[in-house]
A protein has these predicted regions:
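Short, Lys/Arg-rich flexible segments
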Residues: 1-70, 79, 83-144
Length: 144
């Protein structure tokens, strides 16, 4: 006595579950990360916060803060020109961080290393929301 087990290809199963590369679940995860990250980035004019949904392609697995000074703000340290030693560096002059911290305004969550701090605070919440979304997409298929 024997039996035949017919299983769909793994890529097809992933597709049904929304788990394929650049799929619905990845897009949802990216959107949740971006939404939560907005509360942590520096906010003076709002340019960093506004650039996140514009520059990020949800589903790509990357959330982008697309302003020229994003790295400088994320480091949390004052940066000066290597040669000029001034915060107002010469054109095309490389900058380096010095041991002086930046000050952030408009909320206690804003500060240096926004992604790492957001991840530490919101990781479990984001993963739970993403898991619920994936289950809704699959109509409970993975629980059967």
């Amino acid at each position: 006595m024997g039996f035949i087990l017919r299983v769909k290809p793994i890529k097809e199963i992933y597709g049904v579950l929304g788990l394929e590369e650049k799929g619905k679940v990845q897009a949802f995860l990216d959107e949740r990360v971006a939404t939560n990250l907005m509360k942590y980035v520096s906010f003076k004019s709002g340019a960093q916060q506004k650039s996140i949904p514009i520059a990020s392609k949800y589903g790509s697995g990357r959330v982008i803060i697309n302003v020229p000074y994003a790295r400088f703000q994320a480091e949390g340290k004052v940066m000066v020109g290597v040669k000029s030693r001034s915060a107002w560096a010469w054109k095309n002059e490389k900058k380096e961080a010095i041991n002086k911290r930046l000050t952030y305004h408009n909320g206690s969550l804003r500060g240096a290393h926004p992604f790492e701090r957001m991840k530490a605070d919101k990781r479990d919440s984001i993963l739970n929301q993403t898991a619920k979304f994936a289950r809704r997409l699959s109509d409970g298929w993975c629980n059967k």
